[in-house]
């Protein structure tokens, strides 16, 4: 069985790993290749701060909440493992701030120690009148992609830097199954009017005194368009930019000023922080994640395609649950082709 995964961000690499872990012992040979024109450190995943937090509003598809829950549980089970440092995985506590009271999020029982802020805590944030505190997880994308790459390499998965122009091109080369994890660029392979770029710009600063994440929310501005501060192992990520439909990869001075001024107002000690770097990336925004099978007619036969893209700004938050689901879809293909008996479920 020849499988090609297109895309080398967190969605592509985690999906490749799930498929190989589940089926390599019952399907031999299982030949998996990863094609991408961008690898770490140039992927969208590399730009992300990596804080586990779904959108505040409940998704229309309740399964997305399940996938996020599965991802949190998976990461929490590894947070004290010897590999946690290599994964870029650690626990972190922090604040979500609002101008007025809102309902608790659907994931309040998933994170640890969720509670409302006390009046004394709110005194630290004079621009906000309501908030939450809880402990979550950070999974730093750059570390995690390197770890996934190493695990896949150990398993014999091959990586090729190339720009795929069409599914037909890959099918003609002999792929039995194509896994489409191309993120915001999925529309180049198959038209998808629901998919749009959600441009973000972030700054990395040296501020080792920052120990808690601080996310602010402004309904009038919309998601990701108000300041946020997320500490990592080496640097602190500052952000607050979300521009739907903007394809510019250039760092913008106006956005730079918006981020810097907003975050320094939120946490005045950041005025003393040294700016390390600045990055721009595109969140693959879609009303719902596209995670489904499709049969494409390629010449005399059909080629199976598994689509797994459209994860917006929460790819690291939901990736493992989606990878498990994609692996299940792969298993159904094998069942229909009668190529393998299904292994016992341990996902």
From Swiss-Prot:
GO terms for molecular function: D-amino-acid dehydrogenase activity; D-amino-acid oxidase activity; FAD binding; glycine oxidase activity; identical protein binding. It catalyses: a D-alpha-amino acid + O2 + H2O = a 2-oxocarboxylate + H2O2 + NH4(+); D-alanine + O2 + H2O = pyruvate + H2O2 + NH4(+); D-cysteine + O2 + H2O = 2-oxo-3-sulfanylpropanoate + H2O2 + NH4(+); D-dopa + O2 + H2O = 3-(3,4-dihydroxyphenyl)pyruvate + H2O2 + NH4(+). This is D-amino-acid oxidase. Optimum pH is 9.5-10. Residues 216-228 are annotated as: Active site lid that may open upon substrate/product migration in and out of the active site and close to increase the hydrophobicity of the active site, to make the hydride transfer reaction more efficient. Inhibited by benzoate, crotonate, thiolactomycin, chlorpromazine (CPZ), risperidone, haloperidol, sulpiride, aripiprazole, blonanserin, quetiapine, 4H-furo[3,2-b]pyrrole-5-carboxylic acid, and the substrate analog CF3-D-ala (3,3,3-trifluoro-D-alanine). Inhibited by luvadaxistat, and 6-chloro-1,2-benzisoxazol-3(2H)-one (CBIO). It comes from Homo sapiens (Human). Expressed in the cerebellum, in astrocytes of the cortex, in motor neurons and fibers of the lumbar spinal cord (at protein level). Expressed in goblet cells of the small intestine (at protein level). Increased in the cerebellum of schizophrenic patients (at protein level). Decreased in motor neurons of the spinal cord of patients with amyotrophic lateral sclerosis (at protein level). Expressed in the cerebellum, spinal cord, kidney, and thalamus. Abundant in glia of the cerebellum and predominantly neuronal in the dorsolateral prefrontal cortex, hippocampus and substantia nigra. The gene is DAO.
């Amino acid at each position: 069985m020849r499988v090609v995964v297109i895309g080398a961000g967190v969605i592509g690499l985690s999906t490749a790993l799930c498929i190989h872990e589940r089926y390599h012992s019952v399907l031999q040979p299982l030949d998996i290749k990863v094609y991408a024109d961008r690898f770490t450190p140039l992927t969208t995943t590399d730009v992300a701060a990596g804080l586990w937090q779904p959108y505040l509003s409940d998704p229309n598809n309740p399964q997305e909440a399940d996938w996020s829950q599965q991802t949190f549980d998976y990461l929490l089970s590894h947070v004290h493992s010897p590999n946690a440092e290599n994964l870029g995985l650690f626990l972190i506590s922090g604040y979500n701030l609002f101008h007025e009271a809102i309902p608790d999020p659907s994931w309040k029982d998933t994170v640890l120690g969720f509670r409302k802020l006390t009046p004394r805590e709110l005194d630290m944030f004079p621009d906000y009148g309501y908030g939450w505190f809880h402990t979550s997880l950070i999974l730093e994308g750059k570390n995690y992609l390197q770890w996934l790459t190493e695990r896949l390499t150990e398993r014999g998965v091959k990586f090729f830097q190339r720009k795929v122009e069409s599914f037909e091109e890959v099918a003609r080369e002999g792929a039995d199954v194509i896994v489409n994890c191309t993120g915001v660029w999925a529309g180049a392979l198959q038209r998808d009017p629901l998919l749009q770029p959600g441009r973000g710009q972030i700054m990395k600063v040296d501020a080792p005194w920052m120990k808690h994440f601080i996310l602010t929310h402004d309904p009038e501005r919309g998601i990701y368009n108000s300041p946020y501060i997320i500490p990592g192992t080496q640097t602190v990520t500052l952000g607050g930019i979300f521009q739907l439909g903007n394809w510019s990869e250039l760092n913008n001075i106006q956005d730079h000023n918006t981020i810097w001024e907003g975050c320094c107002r939120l946490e005045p000690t950041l005025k003393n922080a040294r700016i390390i770097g600045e990055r721009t990336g595109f969140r693959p925004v879609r009303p719902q994640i596209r995670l489904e099978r499709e049969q494409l007619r390629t010449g005399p036969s059909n080629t199976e395609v598994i689509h797994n893209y459209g994860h917006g700004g929460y790819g690291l938050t939901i990736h493992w649950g989606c990878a498990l689901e994609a692996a299940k879809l792969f298993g159904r293909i094998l069942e229909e082709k009668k190529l393998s008996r299904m292994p016992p479920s341990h996902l």
